[in-house]
Amino acid sequence: DAIMYGGLVGSRKHNESLDTLMARENRIQRLHPMYPNVPIYAFGTIMRTPYASNSGVEPYYYAKYGHDLYVLSGLQDKMDLGTLTKDEAAEMLSLKLSIPSEYLQDWFKRRTKNHAINRLLLKDTKSGIFAYFCEGHDDNSTNSQSAMEARYLGKESAKLSPKVYGSFPGADQLALLLIARYHNDVNHLTPSFTSIYPLGRAEDTVPSYESQPIGKTIAEHVEAVGGIMDPKGRPDIVLAVNTPLSSTGESGQFSNYGMMKPSTTEFMNQVKAVIDKGIPVSMVDVYFANGSDNTLMSLMKQHDLLYKVAAYNGWNTASNTIGYAIAQAILAPDMSETDHRDMLTEQYIDNWAYQANVRKNINRLTELERTNYI
């Protein structure tokens, strides 16, 4: 995305011609023949289909028509699958008539260009240009334009080995994930992982902003770094995945006020038992999206585990958290004690202090000031 569009946000808002994008992609093709002994690890993303009407990181018209575009793309995906009902067909026609045609054309034209580039990068993967290529699904949901594009790319990539190609939810975690993959490759490592969960839906939990169970996403990320899941013997790393009893919510919700929950208490006992055995534990806190679970963090502090884990993550989407949790746990043994402690401290300040607590208070104060000003 950085080479093709100038970055992830740029991939959503650019006005580049397809010829310009293809010329940039051609430069990537030429890298491998020029430097055949240098492995290339790369990632791209399937453009997201957000349901929120926010123009800050989307084209300007998303402020008014963003949600309508989201609903429309979901209906078009259903039509492609052959599951569209008569009522939904009528709704789809109504949306097409209500959204200005120039906005519809702009949005789908940009998506078409991005999809064409993704197909070219997939072709490069088949040609051996990349040591490993990862296709991230940015904020994907079950029915959307993103899901439809992923489905078609999935058909084209069906015969590719998972050792050279991966396609799964997420975007922000991909660069660090590839660093961990390179680390494993050059050191001839095949780390093994096992996951533990609290009571509830566990690996069958489908988190917010994503379209598949979290257990599948974890397995795909482990495969992406060259690891294996559920070894017969002692694992190299245990992923302690903090999932809710039912569905995931937002960390800024009132329900995230830190009330003690029996399931979380028992889960923390599991974590402590694994650490006492000397097995590295990486905390995958996906109870809420966009921030830490205050109950979990209070128990980690109470049990003096904040700096005894290999890694902690609880930020943004579940796949972002999973990718960082796996990658940081792989890289942690090669960090100095100071660097490792600093890494954890940064996560606690960002994920726990800011995202789960400070941010919601800032938002409330900002809204209060705006209301008073009006």
Annotate each PLM feature:
Residues 1-374:
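An N-terminal assembly and electron-transfer interface module characteristic of large anaerobic redox
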